[in-house]
Amino acid sequence: MLNKSVARRYAEAFFSIARETGKVDELQQELEKLVSIIETTENLPEYFAHLLIPAKAKKEVANKLFGGQVSQLTLNFLNMIIDKRRETYIGLISEEYRDMADELRNITKAELTAAAPVSEADMKNLEQNLSAKTGKTVQLSLKVDPGLIGGLKIRIGDQIVDATVAKKLEMLKEQLKQAKIS
């Protein structure tokens, strides 16, 4: 199990450099490109994760693979990660970096859970309403849960709005338990 706080520290360091150089977007794209290539190339994730392969050999492979595709700054960052034996964290580092960049851009992610698919128009309408309420640009993703009887649930960060039928029935049950019969 990878430690998210370790990934966050590396992402913060790289993000700090990106802000100083004014290259937040560019370096985010490069980091995501690195992760994509590593994760989709056969045997490459295992190669970078292998503890018996020396860091020098891994850095040579990284320099050959990514030398012309990313900036020297991103390549130096990857080499530093390899030196510190944190190459398995590159995916998590990229996610943490993306979260920091989104925060800088005033973007927040939200997840809508519904019993059935929701139309694109309804998704856009809900995104706009949530954006107005939060004061941030909301990027809404849909999760279909056929187990829901009806209604929907929205999660924004650590807040949950539960408007499912199951939740309403649970609240009604509690009200009935507390009602005094005379």
From Swiss-Prot:
Task: Report if keyword Iron-sulfur is assigned.
Answer: no
- A Pfam entry, by short name: OSCP
Q: What is its main location?
A: membrane
Which GO cellular component terms are attached? plasma membrane; proton-transporting ATP synthase complex
Cysteine-cysteine disulfides: none
Instruction: Please give the Gene Ontology molecular function terms for this protein.
Output: proton-transporting ATP synthase activity, rotational mechanism
Enumerate the InterPro entries for this protein: ATP_synth_OSCP/delta_N_sf, ATPase_OSCP/dsu
Q: Main role?
A: F(1)F(0) ATP synthase produces ATP from ADP in the presence of a proton or sodium gradient. F-type ATPases consist of two structural domains, F(1) containing the extramembraneous catalytic core and F(0) containing the membrane proton channel, linked together by a central stalk and a peripheral stalk. During catalysis, ATP synthesis in the catalytic domain of F(1) is coupled via a rotary mechanism of the central stalk subunits to proton translocation. This protein is part of the stalk that links CF(0) to CF(1). It either transmits conformational changes from CF(0) to CF(1) or is implicated in proton conduction.
The protein's matches in PANTHER family, at most eight in alphabetical order, are given as:
ATP SYNTHASE DELTA CHAIN
- Provide the assembly information: F-type ATPases have 2 components, F(1) - the catalytic core - and F(0) - the membrane proton channel. F(1) has five subunits: alpha(3), beta(3), gamma(1), delta(1), epsilon(1). F(0) has three main subunits: a(1), b(2) and c(10-14). The alpha and beta chains form an alternating ring which encloses part of the gamma chain. F(1) is attached to F(0) by a central stalk formed by the gamma and epsilon chains, while a peripheral stalk is formed by the delta and b chains.
Q: Which family is this sequence assigned to?
A: Belongs to the ATPase delta chain family.
Q: State the HAMAP family in the record.
A: ATP_synth_delta_bact
The name of this protein is: ATP synthase subunit delta
Tell me which species this is from.
Answer: Syntrophomonas wolfei subsp. wolfei (strain DSM 2245B / Goettingen)
